């Protein structure tokens, strides 16, 4: 998003919006923000004051499909969860197949206020941040003992880079293959660390044998739970 669009959105923050629909009409009419950019901002919880991102995305898709139209096919009503009786107050006339000359803005404002979606999971939020920001910004005491998997290397004993969702720090750790294979982890997974231990680092010597490196320590996770449904 360029500086012009950022300034336009910042100016809108001076306004009071009673609903997400109010904001969408202003974004559409008063700014140069493109649809894909708006979707990204919703994904990143830029408009969280209006509700959960999944609900806002669903509302935005419907807004895009209907806001510039003046008529609706009767066959479309079921797909948007509206009966003919509910749509009737917003149309000037009706034919066998069409609802014509609709007051689409009033219709949409009413319709969007009723739309709900399954709440966004923590994993969905993390996935969006990594995709669009390139990093995770979550830092919350509620997530004590929980981490997101940033990198996975399974060449030898699985090696992970984890992001602490409590304090925003990253750490490197390992898991033995037997434990890992019982609950395989992928980039973006969320886990609660239940048990850990420290072990010396190892490296290959000149004979190709693995030996411990004196005075070193590595963190090994010995028990964890995957929490992707949060």
Regions found by a protein language model. Name each.
Residues 1-230:
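Noncatalytic, beta-rich nucleic-acid-contacting surfaces in large DNA/RNA-processing enzymes
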């Amino acid at each position: 998003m360029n500086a012009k669009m950022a300034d336009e959105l910042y100016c809108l923050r001076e306004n009071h919006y009673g609903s997400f629909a109010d904001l969408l009409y202003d974004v559409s009419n008063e700014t140069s923000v493109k649809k894909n950019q708006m979707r990204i901002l919703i994904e990143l919880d830029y408009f969280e004051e209006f509700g959960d991102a999944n609900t806002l995305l669903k509302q935005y898709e419907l807004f895009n499909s209907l806001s510039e139209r003046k008529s609706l096919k009767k066959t479309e009503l079921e797909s948007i969860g509206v009966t003919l009786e509910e749509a009737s107050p917003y149309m000037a006339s009706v034919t066998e197949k069409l609802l014509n000359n609709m007051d689409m803005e009033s219709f949409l404002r009413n319709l969007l206020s009723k739309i709900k979606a399954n709440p966004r999971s923590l994993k969905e939020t993390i996935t969006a941040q990594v995709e669009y920001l390139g990093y995770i910004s979550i830092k919350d005491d509620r997530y004590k003992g929980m981490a997101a998997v940033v990198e996975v290397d399974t060449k030898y004993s699985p090696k992970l880079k984890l992001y602490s969702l409590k304090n925003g720090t990253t750490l490197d750790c390992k898991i033995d293959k037997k434990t890992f294979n019982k609950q395989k982890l992928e980039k973006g997974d969320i886990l609660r660390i239940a048990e850990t231990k420290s072990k010396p680092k190892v490296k290959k010597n000149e004979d190709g044998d693995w030996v411990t490196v004196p005075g070193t320590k590595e963190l090994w996770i010995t028990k964890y739970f995957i929490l992707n449904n949060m």
